[in-house]
Regions:
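P-loop NTPase catalytic phosphate-binding loop
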Residues: 1, 27-165, 181-190
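Long, charged, glycine-rich C-terminal linkers/tails
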Residues: 163-173
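Interdomain "pre-motor" coupling segment immediately N-terminal to P-loop NTPase/helicase cores
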Residues: 1-34
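Conserved RecA-like ASCE ATPase "motif II neighborhood" in helicase/translocase motors
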Residues: 171-184
Length: 190
């Protein structure tokens, strides 16, 4: 039998985002270089923490690895929002906005979405396509209509590309591959 001891498998109590990447300043993340080196058609892995051995722990939502579906659950104060912020930032550091973008659905009154936008300056994470909060019911309904419209738009673009390239099927991974090869003109992000 395997015997675990607390000393061998102790997780760090706190690691901030920059520390996780081994840098001291945002500029040292070299996001533009990381964007150029990434290949979202092969992997969507991004660091989300440090494991018990002090190594980066990565999550990959590519369909060929951990998969694109997940659930985050926990008690109040357990770190759900911190995890989401870390994961969104980590994907943004590693993938160009043409490759990965986010619509945040925030039912905490906009507090989570506020982590990605400075209300004073208007500067926001370039990957942030929009936010939906529970504060305005009319806005929430408009946002859901917009999401449905975007799904129809993507289906149309995929169908056009499928016909133009004589492909049987096209999914987001194949489409992005064609985009990076210059075979289609419009970027579509995950």
């Amino acid at each position: 039998p395997i015997k675990f001891t607390e000393d061998n498998y102790a997780l760090p109590t706190l690691v901030d985002f920059l520390e996780m990447y081994g840098v001291g300043k945002v500029e040292q993340l070299n996001a533009i270089f990381r964007w150029q080196m990434s290949n979202p058609t092969a992997t969507l892995q991004a660091p989300i923490g440090i494991d018990s051995h002090g190594m980066l722990f990565k999550l990959d939502i590519h369909e060929k690895t951990h998969g694109p579906h997940g659930l985050i659950a926990g008690m109040t104060g357990s770190g759900k929002s911190e995890f989401i912020i870390t994961y969104v930032l980590s994907l943004a550091v590693n993938y160009h906005p043409n490759d990965v973008s986010f619509i945040l659905i925030d039912y905490k009154g906009g507090g989570l979405a506020g982590a990605f936008k400075n209300e004073d300056t208007g500067v926001k994470l370039p990957h942030l396509a929009g936010t939906i909060t529970n504060l305005d019911t009319l806005e929430m309904n408009r946002s859901l209509v917009s999401i449905q419209s975007e799904l129809r738009r993507r289906q149309s673009i995929f169908n056009e590309a499928r016909q133009a390239l004589n492909e049987g099927t096209i999914d987001i991974y194949k489409y992005q591959k064609f985009y990076h090869e210059g075979l289609v003109k419009e970027p579509i992000s995950h």
